[in-house]
């Protein structure tokens, strides 16, 4: 039995106790009325009991609905907390990559963007560290990418990765770590939701 079912079960028990209490109150009131004026009181007692049952049922439904909303809210909060922690861990790992690992990652991101742009001349933008790394190993990059002219563009505020654009700047592929994480966030959310909540 999961947490949501336990909460709903507890709420059902509480609702049943309230129903019993309301019904007992109604029965006591009905008995007094019967003794005072039996003929008129019977009809009124029935009405009071019906009303009490209706009120009790409405109260039970309200409590259950509120509990379901609370369970859903808590579930979403837990999901958000886990997603945030996963994304923070991804950021931490990206920030602590060795230079060689990072270079391989940058090369892969460059390759992907250049292939998508399908251009022979591109401009690459990134943070200062990444542009310096690309500049220092440009021959290695060119040997892998083939006949592509790479111009180093301006520095941008990013934790890593690259932005690659056509020479005229009309088409741009944002392969920064932040942009990629944003693109995959929906997928990450969906995976976490499946793992946590089935």
UniProtKB/Swiss-Prot annotation:
The keyword ATP-binding is assigned to this record: no
One cellular component term from this protein's GO annotations in UniProt: plasma membrane
Example GO BP: proton motive force-driven plasma membrane ATP synthesis
Main subcellular location of this protein, as a coarse class: membrane
KW Cell membrane (keyword) present: yes
Location in the cell: Cell membrane
Keywords on record: ATP synthesis, Cell membrane, Hydrogen ion transport, Ion transport, Membrane, Transport
Matching Pfam families: vATP-synt_E
An example Gene Ontology molecular-function term: proton-transporting ATP synthase activity, rotational mechanism
Membrane topology (UniProt): Peripheral membrane protein
Domain of life, per lineage: Archaea
InterPro entries membership: ATP_synth_B-like_membr_sf, ATPase_E_C, ATPase_V1_Esu
HAMAP family (UniProt xref): ATP_synth_E_arch (MF_00311)
Family: Belongs to the V-ATPase E subunit family.
Quaternary context: Has multiple subunits with at least A(3), B(3), C, D, E, F, H, I and proteolipid K(x).
Purpose of the protein: Component of the A-type ATP synthase that produces ATP from ADP in the presence of a proton gradient across the membrane.
Name of the protein in question: A-type ATP synthase subunit E
């Amino acid at each position: 039995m999961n947490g949501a079912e336990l909460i709903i079960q507890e709420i059902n028990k509480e609702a049943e106790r309230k129903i019993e209490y309301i019904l007992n109150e109604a029965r006591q009131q009905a008995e007094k009325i019967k003794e005072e004026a039996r003929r008129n009181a019977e009809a009124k007692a029935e009405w009071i009991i019906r009303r009490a049952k209706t009120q009790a049922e409405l109260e039970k439904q309200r409590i259950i609905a509120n509990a379901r909303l609370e369970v859903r809210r808590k579930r979403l909060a837990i999901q958000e907390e886990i997603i945030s922690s996963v994304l923070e861990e991804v950021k931490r790992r990206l920030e602590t990559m060795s230079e060689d690992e990072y270079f391989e990652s940058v090369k892969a991101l460059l390759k992907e963007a250049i292939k998508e742009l399908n251009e022979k001349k591109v401009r690459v933008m990134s943070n200062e560290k990444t542009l310096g790394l690309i500049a220092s190993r440009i021959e290695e990059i060119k040997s892998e990418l083939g006949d592509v002219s790479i111009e180093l563009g301006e520095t941008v505020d990013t934790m890593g990765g690259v932005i690659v654009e056509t020479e005229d700047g009309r088409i741009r592929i944002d392969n920064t770590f932040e942009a990629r994480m944003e693109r995959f966030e929906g997928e990450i959310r969906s995976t976490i939701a499946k793992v946590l909540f089935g």
